[in-house]
Amino acid sequence: MKQQANLIRAGQVIEHDGRRWTVLKQQIITPGKGGAFIQVEMRDLKTGNKTNERWRTADTVERLMTEEKDYTYSYTDGDNLVLMDPETFEQALIPAEILGDAVAFLQDNMQVTVDLVEGDPVAIHLPAQVTLEIVEADPVVKGQTASSSYKPAKLSNGVRVMVPPFIEAGERIVVRTEDSTYVERAK
């Protein structure tokens, strides 16, 4: 389906130069002189190579339609994630590199959504938030109450996050999977 370049959004899959690309970032740039253009950072679905492309906002690009399918995460097998279809119980091997750094947030039996283009996986979406345990947290520095102070902490999955001073090791917190930020104490 053809669409104007200025309607491209992160997460969409497009076809350009005979190859499929997933859009990582997009930014509309309006210079002081001349017409606006869109700067797009995208990754080749076959090779994983990243590139930047510029189009005028009036240019058209071929957007590929994606189909969403729900899966349950089972386990990691080398460089692949083993996901199970909850309806048919069939297993699917999907490259872990599609998920990127967010692979650290995968938990057993977690429900994930996979975007497919003509049967090929192009993106994996995790739940917006996950609950994890703090395994180590730096002590609070006294007298830092004038500004909103946060301290570094390490989660059970190895990811480091900034948490409020009242959070201690052994507590469970809710973390946003999109940007690895603290949300609240787990209830």
Curated annotation (Swiss-Prot):
Gene Ontology annotations for the cellular component aspect, listed alphabetically: cytoplasm
Alphabetized Pfam families for the sequence: EFP, EFP_N, Elong-fact-P_C
Superkingdom assignment: Bacteria
Compartment list: Cytoplasm
Molecular functions (GO terms): translation elongation factor activity
Keyword match Calcium: no
Pathway(s) it belongs to: Protein biosynthesis; polypeptide chain elongation
Keywords carried by this UniProt record: Cytoplasm, Elongation factor, Protein biosynthesis
A biological process term (GO) from this entry: peptide biosynthetic process
Main location: cytoplasm
InterPro entries per the UniProt record, alphabetical: Elong-fact-P_C, NA-bd_OB-fold, Rib_uL2_dom2, Transl_elong_fac_P/YeiP, Transl_elong_KOW-like, Transl_elong_P/YeiP_cen, Transl_elong_P/YeiP_CS, Transl_elongation_fac_P
Family affiliation: Belongs to the elongation factor P family.
NCBIfam families: efp, PRK00529.1
Biological function: Involved in peptide bond synthesis. Stimulates efficient translation and peptide-bond synthesis on native or reconstituted 70S ribosomes in vitro. Probably functions indirectly by altering the affinity of the ribosome for aminoacyl-tRNA, thus increasing their reactivity as acceptors for peptidyl transferase.
Protein name, UniProt field: Elongation factor P
